[in-house]
Amino acid sequence: MCSWCWAFKPIWQKILTSLPQNLTVEYLLGGLAPDNDNPMSPETRKFIMDNWRRVQDTVPATEFNYEFWRLNTPKRSTFIACRAVISARIQNPKFER
């Protein structure tokens, strides 16, 4: 998930509750990095962690799990997250939010 999307999720939830009932919100997914099994490079990992810190400085209530980087070997693919959202949507459309 985009770190800015994560940071602004509480605001987005407030916006959703204030929208007219007859307005339909559709979520569209797009992978930013090609689907592959390659581990994320150290440079990319640092770039993303630095971005997380920048987001936290800008939106202080935002929290990220930095243990993720120590406990996992992330892949350089955004399609994995997209497939997870699609799977959640198939189970229940409310889950994709």
PLM features per residue range, with description:
Residues 10-97:
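Structural alpha/beta surface segment adjacent to cysteine/selenocysteine redox centers
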